[in-house]
């Protein structure tokens, strides 16, 4: 018998990658959960949080998502957080702010449909914009429904740079510093010193009023009317700003009731 001829086994050819560029990994920028987005809007970012996940489930997903998105910016930018009907307390807002800070982002404004979240955010010093409730969440009632008819009550001082937007009246127990602003569809009541901007009746309500213990606002607005407080300011005492045919008038609180009664008489 003749020995079987052996066939040499071909070795696989391995091409050298020396000097060639490595193929980069594809970055995952798709949200890990539905409804979690981070969008650039004119020098700011808008972070949208879904409302259908518990915080304990959303929190780790949010952290991973921020890691996958941090290539999108190269400087510290303000962030508006739109959390819809999600209820966030102060500790959760602080967690969120710290997570954003780790990625060179700064939490600046909370956009929410929950009054409790708005109060927590304002107490921590963030600007607040309260949204109207979706129609399905508004309880049916006789006549036109008012989605956010309840006033927003805040027991805090509004520092410079803070903005409060609300679709009803706003009550502040504390001062409103210069550089802060309140925009309300209803009345504005400041149980303290008003030095910032106050815009009552922002949706056209000329019957709205601005009331404060000390009127030293940089700007007053009622509906589309505009006024400034006297310079130099008068001695501090409670005053009321209200709209008339001649524009915005300011009256001492102890006489305003009498003035209002006369103007409202038939």
UniProtKB/Swiss-Prot annotation:
One of its GO terms (biological process) is division septum assembly. InterPro entries: CAP/MinC_C (IPR016098), MinC (IPR013033), MinC_C_sf (IPR036145), Septum_form_inhib_MinC_C (IPR005526). Residues 1-21 have a biased composition (Low complexity). It holds the Pfam family MinC_C. Residues 1-28 are annotated as: Disordered. The keyword Cell division applies. Keywords: Cell cycle, Cell division, Septation. Interacts with MinD and FtsZ. Belongs to the MinC family. This is Probable septum site-determining protein MinC. The lineage of its organism: Bacteria, Bacillati, Cyanobacteriota, Cyanophyceae, Acaryochloridales.
């Amino acid at each position: 018998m003749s020995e079987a001829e052996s066939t040499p086994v071909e070795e696989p050819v391995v091409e050298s990658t020396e000097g060639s560029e490595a193929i980069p990994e594809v970055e995952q920028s798709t949200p890990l959960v539905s409804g979690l987005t981070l969008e650039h809007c004119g020098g700011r970012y808008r972070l949208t949080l879904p409302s259908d996940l518990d915080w304990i489930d959303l929190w780790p997903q949010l952290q991973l998502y921020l890691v996958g998105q941090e290539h999108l910016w190269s400087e510290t930018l303000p962030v508006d957080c739109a959390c819809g009907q999600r209820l966030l307390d102060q500790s959760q807002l602080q967690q969120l702010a710290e997570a954003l800070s780790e990625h060179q982002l700064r939490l600046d404004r909370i956009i929410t449909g929950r009054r409790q979240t708005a109060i927590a955010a304002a107490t921590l010093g963030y600007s607040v914009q309260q949204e109207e409730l979706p129609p399905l969440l508004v309880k049916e009632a006789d006549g036109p429904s008012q989605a956010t008819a309840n006033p927003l009550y805040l027991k805090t001082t509004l520092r410079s740079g803070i903005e409060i937007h609300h679709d009803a009246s706003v009550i502040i127990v504390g001062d409103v510093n210069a550089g802060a602003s309140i925009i309300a569809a209803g009345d504005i009541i400041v149980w303290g010193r008003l030095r910032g901007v106050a815009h009552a009746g922002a949706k056209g309500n000329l019957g709205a009023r601005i009331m404060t213990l000390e009127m030293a606002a940089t700007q007053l607005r009622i509906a589309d009317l505009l006024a400034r407080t006297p310079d130099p300011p008068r001695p501090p005492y409670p005053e009321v700003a209200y709209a008339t045919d001649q524009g915005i008038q300011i009256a001492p609180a102890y006489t305003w009731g009498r003035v209002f009664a006369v103007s409202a008489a038939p």
